[in-house]
A protein has these predicted regions:
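Conserved acidic segment of CheY-like receiver
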Residues: 4-23
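Receiver (REC) domain active-site loop signature in two-component systems and cognate sites
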Residues: 61
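C-terminal output helix
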Residues: 114-124
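CheY-like receiver
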Residues: 123-124, 128-138
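As written
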Residues: 101-107
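Acidic, metal-coordinating helix/loop segments flanking the phosphotransfer/catalytic sites
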Residues: 34-54, 120
């Protein structure tokens, strides 16, 4: 499996802990780097030297929401060409919200599961898919 970091952007501490626990129980070797604010995540993405494995971001975030963060990444001439896989996970997913998200060229939208089993299923599917996919080398 690719060893690059998984970037988790979510202000819900419990959801972050569940995600990290699920990765550990699934023996996912990737470090999970957590940001509870979109601005901090964006600043990190600008400064990073290695490509993340993927970004999974909550839509409902304080100050800069997930949609705005994705828009900022798309508009950035350094980040856009890196084609970092960007996925949303959210507690809600109206058709309108999902349409807005996909208009920003995301690679997936998941409703946060209420069970550890559900979280593990999403993590397994996402990691297997992106492990097989190639990305631009920057």
């Amino acid at each position: 499996m690719k060893s690059n970091r998984i970037i988790l952007i979510d202000d819900d501490e419990e959801d972050c802990e569940l995600f990290i626990t699920a990765c550990a129980e699934l023996n996912i070797p990737n470090e999970v780097l957590v940001f509870n604010e979109s601005k901090k995540a964006f600043d990190y993405l600008l400064s990073m030297t290695t490509q993340p494995f993927f970004i999974i971001c909550d839509v409902n975030m304080p100050v800069i929401d997930g949609l705005e963060l994705r828009k900022k990444i798309n508009e950035n001439n350094e980040l856009r060409p890196r084609a970092i896989p960007f996925l949303f996970w959210s507690t809600s997913g109206s058709g309108n919200l999902i349409n807005k998200a996909y208009a920003l060229n995301i690679q997936g939208f998941f409703i946060k599961p209420s069970t550890m089993k559900g979280i593990k299923e999403i993590i397994t599917a996402v990691t297997l898919y992106w492990d097989c996919s190639y990305h631009p080398i920057r």
